[in-house]
Regions:
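N-terminal signal-anchor/signal peptide hydrophobic helix marking the start
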Residues: 1-13
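Broad hydrophobic/π-residue packing in well-ordered secondary structure
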Residues: 4-5, 53-57, 87-89, 99
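Aliphatic-rich helix starts adjacent to a transmembrane/signal segment
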Residues: 12-41
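Membrane-proximal N-terminal amphipathic helix
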Residues: 31-58
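Extracytoplasmic/secreted envelope proteins and their assembly/folding machinery
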Residues: 43, 47, 66, 110-112
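Short, glycine/small-hydrophobic-rich surface segments
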Residues: 50-78
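Intrinsically disordered, low-complexity regions enriched in Pro/Ser/Thr/Gly and acidic residues
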Residues: 72-162
């Protein structure tokens, strides 16, 4: 029995090491997924703040200032705000406006923002002068952008007739 004890201890230790390695991988996946969710929710809050500003200032065109976004959108991190931008463009028809928010995030962030807003089809990914919605069941046809947005950026595109 004495010669089996080291073998049994080795097998048990190997089992614990395998279990620990498996748990470490799961935690890493959950951390990455949590970051995507957090970015998706932050992008949704950013878009909502820009939209609130636009609704309160219906003749505005240009880039909504960061100070106004933080006033309407609550606590968004300075690191997040440094990555995102927006533009409000006149359509030239009556008082129409197109509000575009964008940032260099993955498609997963657009999907999370869409899911967090009840599958809002205004979230998607830019292809430069076009964009495609990330909403579940949305048409996959590329839609035109009124201004060029860097390709691969997550976007929220909303057209309003004020």
């Amino acid at each position: 029995m004495g010669f089996l004890a080291p073998l049994i201890i080795s097998v048990v230790m190997l089992g614990f090491a395998a279990l620990f390695a498996q748990e470490s991988r799961v935690a890493a996946i959950d951390t990455a997924q949590a970051q995507v969710q957090s970015s998706g929710h932050a992008f949704l809050a950013y878009r909502n703040a820009v939209m609130t500003y636009q609704q309160n200032n219906p003749t505005f065109t240009g880039v909504v200032p960061t100070a106004a976004i933080t006033a309407y959108g609550g606590p968004l991190s300075s690191a997040f705000l440094a990555q995102v931008s927006n533009v409000v463009v006149s359509t030239g028809v009556r008082n129409g406006r197109v509000v575009i928010c964008y940032g260099p995030f993955s498609l997963s962030v657009a999907e999370q923002a869409a899911l967090a807003s009840s599958n809002d089809a205004s979230f998607g990914v830019s292809n430069g002068t076009t964009w495609t919605s990330a909403a579940v069941g949305a048409p996959t046809a590329a839609l035109p952008l009124i201004t060029n947005i860097p390709s691969g950026n997550v976007v929220s595109v909303i057209q309003m007739d004020i």
